[in-house]
């Protein structure tokens, strides 16, 4: 079985000021997910996208603690950064769930980014 899993970002939905190009590219990934799933369905290929929020990556973890705390304060629940293992768990679920196709799933603790 073949499954394509793209990575977008919540910036596709909540782009901040100064992120025009980044938000547009991530929006493009979201926008191509359903048509791609439809186009590839005839050959048995599924396509989904994950739009992660603020994840505990090496780049973010290298930021000052005050910056990290400020970011976490805007995440409703759970009030923490997302873990890479949680991203991996969602990938596994998308691969194993054969009825999940053409979808974009936000993995973001219900955060909505502010304009700045």
Regions inferred by a protein language model and the residue ranges of each:
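Alpha-helical segment proximal to the catalytic Tyr-Lys
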Residues: 38-42
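Active-site helix of classical SDR
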Residues: 25, 33
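C-terminal substrate-recognition "lid" of short-chain dehydrogenase/reductases
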Residues: 83-107, 112
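Short, flexible catalytic-loop segment of classical short-chain dehydrogenase/reductase
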Residues: 51-62
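Cytosolic ligand/metal-binding cores
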Residues: 20
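Catalytic Tyr-x(3-8)-Lys segment
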Residues: 66-86
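Residue(s) in the substrate-gating loop at a strand-loop-helix junction
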Residues: 9
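Conserved catalytic-site region of short-chain dehydrogenase/reductase
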Residues: 12-14, 113
């Amino acid at each position: 079985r073949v499954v394509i899993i793209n990575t977008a970002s919540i910036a596709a939905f909540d782009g901040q000021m100064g992120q025009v190009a980044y938000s547009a590219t991530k929006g493009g990934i979201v926008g191509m997910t359903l048509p791609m799933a439809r186009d590839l369905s005839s050959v048995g290929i599924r396509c989904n996208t994950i739009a992660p929020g603020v994840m505990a990556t090496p780049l973010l973890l290298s930021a000052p603690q005050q910056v990290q705390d400020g970011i976490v304060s805007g995440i409703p629940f759970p009030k923490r950064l997302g873990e890479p293992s949680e991203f991996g768990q969602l990938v596994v679920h998308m691969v194993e769930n054969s009825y999940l196709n053409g979808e974009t799933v936000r993995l973001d603790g219900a955060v909505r980014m502010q304009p700045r």
